Every structure is written in structure tokens, then in C-alpha cells.
Amino acid sequence: YAQGYFDYDSKKSGGLTMSHLRFGHTPIKSTYYISQADFVACHNPAYLETYDMVQDLKKGGSFLLNCPWDAAELEERLPGKVKKFIADNEINLYTIDGFKIGKEIGLGTRINTVLQSAFFSIAKIIPEEDAIKYMKDAATKSYSKEGEAIVKMNHDAIDRGATGYVKVEVPASWKNAVDDSVKHVATGDRPDLVEYVNNVVIPVNTFHGKDLPVSTFETVSYTHLTLPTNSRV
């Protein structure tokens, strides 16, 4: 059995999408977000600075990061709180350069097939050889009308994704990493708007809206007209 819930913001084109996936041997009736995940993938390394990408992983879980960084660059670029969480919770860390793979095989920035194949290889939801076969069968069915070259590109993406990731040895020093993240705060000459942006807009934009108490919200049905500008804080 499988369950999928796809959470995305109002800026669908180029916006953030989160896929909550559950698998099991019995019917799945959960009606809530996953908060104890076995596997999390981050397809855009820029998200590490804005969202809590690893906080919902259970101890011993796996984190796949799509990035072009080697071990030295990971040490430099990973936020301190991410490094500490990974080390403290014995997270299995993997990296894959999906964009490089996509470019090499002719798919450009379309990396979903590459990352999906890496997921099945790491997560072991089903035997890897079965997952690869099913993915290739689906790609053939979906793209056969586009021509043999397109089908081959997608088959190559599946093969490269299943073998193109690297398991990172997590340094013991990461346990002592310091949270060096920058907290974004709105300022201005309108106290009511500043308060609303800091207490509501920023938490919602960083996907902490579900943690806000009811008392945070206005009791009247209006919103500030300048919110599109402030939503980019």
C-alpha cells in the first residue's frame, strides 16, 4: 500500500513542493503530515538556509541532498544546525549532483527521474532491480511517442540516479557545530505590519505556520495590502 500527499505553495511555478509518501503492508489511513521520516530528500540546496530540511528525520534515517559539493564544500556550506542534527541523530547522509547528471544525458534541469531512482536505491522500499524495471517500463510508456532518444534519456537517468549518489562520512566534529543561521526580521515604520510579518508571514513562509497558536491571528477578515512584498523577507 502507498499514500501520497503533495503540499505546495501558491507560487506553484518555481515554488516549493513537498511530497509526503508513506508505504506499508496494510491500508494507510493517516491524515496528517509525516513528522518521523525514514527518508528525506532535498532537491535544491538553497532550501537548507530557509527550511528545516532534516528536523523531521527519525534517528538513523537517511537524508539525500542534491548538490555539486564535495566533502570540503559540505563542511563549509551546510548550516551548523543541519550538521549538528545529522551527527546527533546518526543520520545517513548522501549527496548526488542531479543537475550534472541531467545535463550529461540531455535532460537539462529535469532531474525528477534521477532523484526518484536514487530514492528507490537508498530507501529499499522494494528490491532495487524491481524499482528500476518498473520505472523504465513507465518511462517507455510515457515517452514512447516522443521517440526512442527521449526514452533512452529517461532510462539513462534511472540508471545514473541509482548509482550516482555518494554516502558521506559524517565527521564527529559536527556534534559540536553551532547554529549559525540568520533569523530574518521585518522592520519598518508601520508597527502593525511589522508585527504581522514577523509573527505570521515569516513563520508561514518557512512552513512553521502549523505551530502558530490561534491567538496569533487577527480576529477580523482583512489582510495587509503589502504582503506580496513582505512575503519575500
Q: Where do the protein language model's features map onto the residues?
A:
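Glycine-rich phosphate-binding loop
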Residues: 27-59
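Anionic-ligand anchoring segments at beta-strand to alpha-helix junctions in alpha/beta enzyme folds, i.e.
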Residues: 1-40
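Redox-cofactor binding/interface segments in oxidoreductases and associated redox assembly factors
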Residues: 42, 65, 116
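Short glycine-rich anion-binding loops that position phosphate/pyrophosphate groups of nucleotides
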Residues: 45-47, 69-70, 99
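ADP-ribose/adenylate-binding Rossmann-like module
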Residues: 56-82
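Ferredoxin-type iron-sulfur electron-transfer modules and their immediate structural context
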Residues: 131-132, 144-232
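Short alpha-helices
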Residues: 77-142
